[in-house]
Curated annotation (Swiss-Prot):
Keywords: Disulfide bond, Glycoprotein, Lipoprotein, Membrane, Receptor, Signal, Transmembrane, Transmembrane helix. This is Low-density lipoprotein receptor class A domain-containing protein 2. The gene is LDLRAD2. The lineage of its organism: Eukaryota, Metazoa, Chordata, Craniata, Vertebrata. SMART domains: LDLa. Residues 1-25 form the signal peptide. Belongs to the LDLR family.
Length: 272
């Protein structure tokens, strides 16, 4: 029998009557804890859930949305993954009485992550739904808002990802740091202790000029949330999705170097 731990979170309406979190420097947060909220700041290390890289997020029927807002007017948002795993062992069954052909999107039957362009009042899908085990290419918004929506469907969903959020601008940098590729990022993100590639070309973490990062920095704990360094204000935000109570179920993630699909197949066989 599969062992799991369940934690019930307070009920939230996704991005509706949500709290806006404002940050001024780099921090960590968990998507599962920010459902229905709008986060604003310089940079963010975003995990799927608090136990990322140790346990899967396996809550079925999850519909969790988050808006990320750039730090300043004229900025955009860039998101790149460090690690990505989103799928379901068994896809959701097809709807009854449907005569239309199966969708070409391979994520359609199961769990997926979808990005959106803003504004929140009129979200537009940005790219195709993402699923599988391969790290997707980075995405960037054309305006100050980038939305994320995690949907789990089917039998035994498996979710675990870590991504880097960066507020950036193009053109004159002003007080921002100019990357070698021409992007401008907040100076607070240069030589950050997580080693995040906020520029996208590594120049904000280089030991050479203009970053001049001096040796490795102590890596802070990644178990914190945004609560300690943010101010909250209530803002009405339209929903990317809707859900009732959100449950987090945890199962141990596969060890490094092992194929999680093989591990799940073995686990599934042992329970039947």
């Amino acid at each position: 029998m599969e062992a799991c731990c369940l934690l019930q979170l307070p009920q939230r309406l996704l991005l509706l009557g949500a709290a806006a979190l404002t940050a001024t420097a780099l921090e960590t947060a968990d998507l599962a804890e920010l459902c229905g909220q709008t986060w604003q700041g310089d940079g963010l290390l975003l995990r799927s859930h608090a136990a990322s890289r140790r346990f899967y997020f396996v809550a079925p029927d999850t519909d969790c949305g988050l808006w990320v807002q750039a730090a300043a007017p004229g900025d955009r948002i860039r998101f790149q993954f460090r690690f990505f795993l989103v799928y379901s062992l068994t896809p959701a069954p097809p709807a009854l009485n449907t005569s239309s052909p199966a969708p070409a999107d391979p994520c359609a039957p199961g769990s997926y992550l979808q990005f959106y362009e803003g504004p929140p009042g009129a979200p537009r899908p940005l790219g195709s739904p993402l699923c599988g085990l391969n790290i997707p290419v980075p995405v960037a918004s054309s305006g100050p808002f980038l939305g994320l929506r995690l949907v789990t469907r089917g039998r035994q969903p498996r979710v675990d990802f870590v991504g880097e959020v960066t507020s950036f601008r193009l053109g004159p940098c002003g007080a921002y740091f100019r990357c070698q590729n021409g992007r401008c990022i907040p100076s607070s993100l240069v030589c950050d202790p997580w080693g995040m590639d906020n520029c996208g070309d590594g120049s904000d973490q280089g030991s050479w000029s203009p970053a001049d990062c001096r040796g490795p920095s102590p890596v802070p704990s990644q178990t914190g949330s945004t609560d300690a360094h943010t101010s909250r204000s209530l803002t009405p935000s339209p929903a990317l999705g809707s859900a009732g109570s959100l449950w987090i179920a945890a199962e141990r993630s596969s060890p490094a170097g092992r194929d999680p699909t093989r591990q799940d197949a073995a686990l599934e066989g042992s329970t039947e």
